[in-house]
Amino acid sequence: VITKAGGSAAYGEWAAKKIKTRAGAQFATGVLGTVIFIDDYFNCLTVGTVMRPVTDKHHISRAKLAYLIDATAAPVCIIAPISSWAVAVGSTMESSGVADGMSTFIQTIPFNLYALLTIVMIIFICWTNLDFGPMAKFEHNAIYNNDLHSNPDHPQDIEEENSRIGNKGKVYDLIIPIVALIIFSILAMLYVGGLFT
């Protein structure tokens, strides 16, 4: 809906004036992925929709965008005390006999090395512009061939995707649906947690 209404394109034009470099676009993706920690699926959908126009402008491959999004989604959610994962893990601990599941969950955050090291790795990759393995092929193709979607071995047709993007939107076409989704997600978590009963 956001893409079809043109909200993503409008945000991309606005953000393009603020974000001037490839590293800046990558850092902005990582920061936004860290800030939206309500749920990992919500994070992926939101950050992908919002940052795709910005990363496209700076010739960052979709593969790297996907990596940046995925590497901030679940790791941030599992260490954020206010997330769907915190509620799930805390309640599972309590059903397993732990007296205070949420308190125990919070105490385990410093020991969640996977999540913490993944976030450190994102910062390192954005800062050093290090690409390796298949990611290096995708990035090379994005930078030198202006092909954000594929590597030279597997070209991809993108006409269908481009036909779905609206271009007459405003930034509020992006902000209003995302803010509404955040508010209703928090209310839904509070409702499921029993706050309103």
Where in the sequence are the language-model features?
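Membrane-interface helix termini and inter-helical loops of multi-pass transporters
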Residues: 11, 99-104, 194-197
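Alpha-helical transmembrane segments and, especially, the helix-loop junctions at the ends
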Residues: 33-52, 62-135
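Alpha-helical transmembrane segments and their helix-start/interface "positive-inside/aromatic belt" motifs
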Residues: 26-30, 63-78, 166-178
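Membrane-embedded alpha-helical segments and adjacent helix-loop junctions characteristic
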Residues: 1-66
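Membrane-interface elements of multi-pass transporters and channels
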Residues: 5-9, 18, 58, 95-96, ...
